[in-house]
UniProtKB/Swiss-Prot annotation:
It is found in: Cytoplasm. The lineage of its organism: Bacteria, Bacillati, Actinomycetota, Actinomycetes, Kitasatosporales. It comes from Kitasatospora aureofaciens. Residues 62-66 are annotated as: G2. Belongs to the TRAFAC class translation factor GTPase superfamily. Classic translation factor GTPase family. EF-Tu/EF-1A subfamily. This is Elongation factor Tu. GO terms for molecular function: GTP binding; GTPase activity; translation elongation factor activity.
Length: 397
C-alpha cells in the first residue's frame, strides 16, 4: 500500500469538471475521491455522490450559485475540485469566477459525443481564461466498438481546436466513472491514469506572491507629520519599503511615488505580501492625489483602460436582479475591485436585448479609466444594487 505523507509544501491546483448535463461530471468527481482514497487513505477522504450533488448554495457578488467543493491529493499535488450540479450554476461560476480554475476536466460521454453544453462550456473556458483542459471520455465501458470511441475522441479534439485549445495534443483518457465508483479495479486504474494526465498536463499556476505587485486603494488618510497613508488588501505580489510604485486608474494621469513605510495592525513591516491588509505611507503625496478605486502597482505592470469586451451573467428577477430586459446603450455602473464607474453597453450584433437570467457578451465604454487586464472581474450595479457580474475578455482601448 503506497503511503504518501501530507506535505504542506505540495503544490496546490484548482480544477473543476465541466461538460454536458448527464455526461457524468458529478459521478466522476465522486469516483476520483474514491480511487484516490483507496490508493492513499491517509491523504484522502472519499466524497459520496449525493454529498456532491446536493451542493450548498454560495453567494458571490450577490449571485446565488450551487457549487460543490471537494479536495484530494495525488502523490504529486493537492487539488481543490469544483463541481456544479446545474448548467446555469456552471455558467454563473465560470463568468463570476466564484471558483477559479487553473485547469478543467472536460467530461464527454462516449455514448453521446460532444453535445450543446459541451460546446458552451468549452467556449466559456476559452473566454474566461481556463488555461488547460484534460478530457475524460466517460461511460467508455458502454461502447464496445473501438472505432466509435476513436470517432468520439476525434470529434472532441476538433471541438477543442476550434476554440483555440491544443486539441491534437491534450490528453483524452477513456474512463468509466460509475464502474470505478463501484470498485472495479480495471476502471479504477484508468481513473488513476486520468489523474496522472491531470498532474502532467495542467501546470501548477504561479503563486500570487510571484506576480507583479498590485493593491487596490480602499481608504486614504493623512497622518500629521508623517504624510499620506493608503490602505487596502494586497491582491498579488510583494512590496518592500523604499520601492517605487505607480498609482493608476480613475484619474487621467498616473502618479509615481516611493513607499516609505508599510504597516499592518500598527506594526511596521519590511514588506507586505499578497493577501495582507496593509497601510502604505507614500512620499510627497497629498491626500487629494489618491482616491478609492485607484490601484497601486509595480511600475508599468498594468495600464488603465476605458473600453473592453466582456462576458457577463445578468441576474434573474428571483435573484434580486432586474425585472425587465435592457437594450443597447444601457448605462449601469461597473464595480471594479473597490469602486463603481459608469459605462455604456453595446450589445453584440443581432442581440436586440438581454433578459434577466441571460448570459451575454458585451462591449463597454467607461467614463473613467480603470486599471485592468484580461480576466478582471466586475459586478454590474444600478444604484448600489448588483444586477449582473462579468469579466473582461478583451481590452480594446
Amino acid at each position: 500500500m503506497a503511503k504518501a505523507k501530507f506535505e504542506r509544501t505540495k503544490p496546490h491546483v484548482n480544477i473543476g469538471t465541466i461538460g454536458h448535463i448527464d455526461h457524468g461530471k458529478t459521478t466522476l468527481t465522486a469516483a476520483i475521491t474514491k480511487v484516490l482514497h483507496d490508493k492513499y487513505p491517509d491523504l484522502n477522504a472519499a466524497s459520496a455522490f449525493d454529498q456532491i450533488d446536493k451542493a450548498p448554495e454560495e453567494r458571490q457578488r450577490g449571485i446565488t450559485i450551487s457549487i460543490a467543493h471537494v479536495e484530494y491529493q495525488t502523490e504529486a499535488r493537492h487539488y481543490a475540485h469544483v463541481d456544479c450540479p446545474g448548467h446555469a450554476d456552471y455558467i454563473k461560476n465560470m463568468i463570476t469566477g466564484a471558483a477559479q480554475m487553473d485547469g478543467a476536466i472536460l467530461v464527454v460521454a462516449a455514448t453521446d459525443g460532444p453535445m450543446p453544453q459541451t460546446k458552451e462550456h468549452v467556449l466559456l473556458a476559452r473566454q474566461v481564461g481556463v488555461p488547460y483542459i484534460v478530457v475524460a471520455l466517460n461511460k467508455a465501458d458502454m461502447v464496445d466498438d473501438e472505432e466509435i470511441l476513436e470517432l468520439v475522441e476525434l470529434e472532441v479534439r476538433e471541438l477543442l481546436s476550434e476554440y483555440d485549445f491544443p486539441g491534437d495534443d491534450l490528453p483524452v483518457v477513456q474512463v468509466s466513472a460509475l464502474k470505478a465508483l463501484e470498485g472495479d479495479k480495471e476502471w479504477g486504474d484508468k481513473l488513476l491514469g486520468l489523474m496522472d494526465a491531470v498532474d502532467e498536463a495542467i501546470p501548477t499556476p504561479p503563486r500570487d506572491t510571484d506576480k507583479p505587485f498590485l493593491m487596490p486603494v480602499e481608504d486614504v488618510f493623512t497622518i500629521t507629520g508623517r504624510g499620506t497613508v493608503v490602505t487596502g488588501r494586497i491582491e498579488r505580489g510583494v512590496l518592500k519599503v523604499n520601492e517605487t510604485v505607480d498609482i493608476i486608474g480613475i484619474k487621467t494621469e498616473k502618479t509615481t511615488t516611493t513607499v516609505t513605510g508599510i504597516e499592518m495592525f500598527r506594526k511596521l513591516l519590511d514588506e507586505g505580501q499578497a493577501g495582507e491588509n496593509v497601510g502604505l505611507l507614500l512620499r510627497g503625496i497629498k491626500r487629494e492625489d489618491v482616491e478609492r478605486g485607484q490601484v497601486i502597482i509595480k511600475p508599468g505592470s498594468v495600464t488603465p483602460h476605458t473600453e473592453f469586451e466582456a462576458a457577463a451573467y445578468i441576474l434573474s428577477k428571483d435573484e434580486g436582479g432586474r425585472h425587465t430586459p435592457f437594450f443597447n446603450n444601457y448605462r449601469p455602473q461597473f464595480y471594479f475591485r473597490t469602486t463603481d464607474v459608469t459605462g455604456v453597453v453595446t450589445l453584440p450584433e443581432g442581440t436586440e436585448m438581454v433578459m434577466p437570467g441571460d448570459n451575454t457578451d458585451m462591449t463597454v465604454a467607461l467614463i473613467q479609466p480603470v486599471a485592468m487586464e484580461e480576466g478582471l472581474k466586475f459586478a454590474i450595479r444600478e444604484g448600489g444594487r448588483t444586477v449582473g457580474a462579468g469579466q473582461v475578455t478583451k481590452i480594446t482601448k
